[in-house]
Amino acid sequence: MGLIMDIEFEELTHRNFSNACNIDRDDIPENFVDTASTIMNITDYGLNHHCVGHSFVVKYHGKPIGLILLGEAIPWETDPPEMSKEPFYRLMGFVVDREYRGCGIGGEILEKTIQRVYRDFGKRPIALGCHKDNIRAERFYLRHGFKKTDAMEGNDYYYLRFTE
């Protein structure tokens, strides 16, 4: 439990962007998870268009070990029909450094990010895309209350998590 208690969330900015680039994700193809550059661009877009949400560089003892973006979703044509009825958040770019996977820290990062966004901006359903071949991520999201849909965008299945 000590490992999890020592994580720190820092808003992603251009000042700490190089930290996000140092996260070891060489074993994860870009078609599975967006790069730090893509997440920085999406973060900038969200800020410029006043979208609510957070993009975090996550640190453990000062070392960047994770990146996550959870923010107001801009509707896409490929969104599942369930999401057309109400505003929702979109989870993007979530990656944990290779050295820190499999110890529960990813779940802690995800849940704390969701709670922070809910606290700061209100509760909404969450949607994410997960590559059809990314079985490890699929199992992770199912364990964390997401439901797989039949809707796809390219090679990504949509997963949804509704508020209680």
Regions inferred by a protein language model and the residue ranges of each:
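Conserved glycine-rich acetyl-CoA-binding loop
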Residues: 93, 97-111, 132-139, 143
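C-terminal "cap" of GNAT-fold acetyltransferases
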Residues: 85-88, 123-138, 142-164
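Short glycine-rich loop/turn motifs that provide flexible caps or phosphate-binding loops at active sites
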Residues: 65, 103-105, 128
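Short coil/turn segments at alpha/beta junctions that flank glycine-rich nucleotide-binding fingerprints
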Residues: 103, 120-124
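Short, Lys/Arg-enriched N-terminal segments with co-localized hydrophobic residues
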Residues: 1-4
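Acetyl-CoA-dependent GNAT
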Residues: 6-99, 110-112, 116, 120, ...
